[in-house]
Amino acid sequence: MNTFFKLGSLIQRTASQISSSFPKSRFFSDGESAVYHHARLFKKPLSTKLKFNLVNSVSLMGFVDRSIQVMNTGPDRFGVFTILRVKDPLNPNRSFRISLRMWDAMARTCIAHLKLNDHILVSGRLESYSKSSSDVYSGLNLDYQVKVAEVNYVAAPPSHVLDSQISKNPKTKTEDDIEESKKDEIYLWQVFFSNPYDWWDNRRNKKNPKQPDFKHKDTGEALWLCSDLPDWITRRLELFDQKNRFYDEEKTRRDRLSDYI
């Protein structure tokens, strides 16, 4: 009896000494060793088969920043577009905008149901397109859009995401409408300057003042010149016209030289 008691005490002391000889830092609270933990964190990513339906697939959550607009398309296709404003969940003051394009059945669903400031989750394929491709003096300039395949409403968005949409000093509807209209106009000018050759320039052949000075070739959106335009728009237009004049002069000079060759 005493022999077994002494042997048990010896085993307990030995086990205690062995366990105490290992630094506690080599193990985590869940019993996982530091070596295994490091290997698990930095292991090589798994391989997967190429799935073409998932190439450039994206899902974005944000707010409808513009009313749904119908695109000028052929009789066999129906397309609409809008702008999605995506906010950083950790910093509501940071956001970006991206164009959404919807076609056929999806386009009809969106134009029937989506409204300005709707909080939505869209899934689709990210596409790129070249801007100012007709401008020989600019380098490759890409922009991005999402060809939408699925749209879902987002229920009960977090309050910190909506804080910029809720004004502390309530405004009248008229003031809101004016502010929204100005914001849309400024954004349209930014779209224009990003790719001015996607717009018809009607400044020299307007039949009446109500006609727009610039009209988008696909979406039909319009811009008018007015006396209260911001200075930066006026300066950008002057540079745009100057560059076009220089291009026309260079083209004329090359054509004349070719006549003598």
From Swiss-Prot:
Effect of gene knockout: Severe leaf variegation, distortion and partial sterility.
Annotated localization: Mitochondrion
GO CC term (a single one): mitochondrion
PDF region: annotated span: 189-238
Record bears the keyword Transit peptide: yes
Domain SSB: from-to ranges: 55-155
UniProt-listed GO biological process terms: DNA replication; mitochondrial genome maintenance; negative regulation of DNA recombination
Keyword Signal assigned: no
Gene Ontology MF terms in the entry: single-stranded DNA binding
Keyword annotations of the record: DNA-binding, Mitochondrion, Transit peptide
Role, per record: Regulates mitochondrial DNA recombination. Represses homologous recombination, preventing mitochondrial genome instability and unbalanced transmission of alternative mtDNA configurations. Binds preferentially single-stranded DNA. Does not bind to RNA.
Domain remarks: The PDF region is required for protein-DNA interaction while the SSB domain is not required for ssDNA binding.
Name of this chain's protein: Protein OSB1, mitochondrial
Organism this protein belongs to: Arabidopsis thaliana
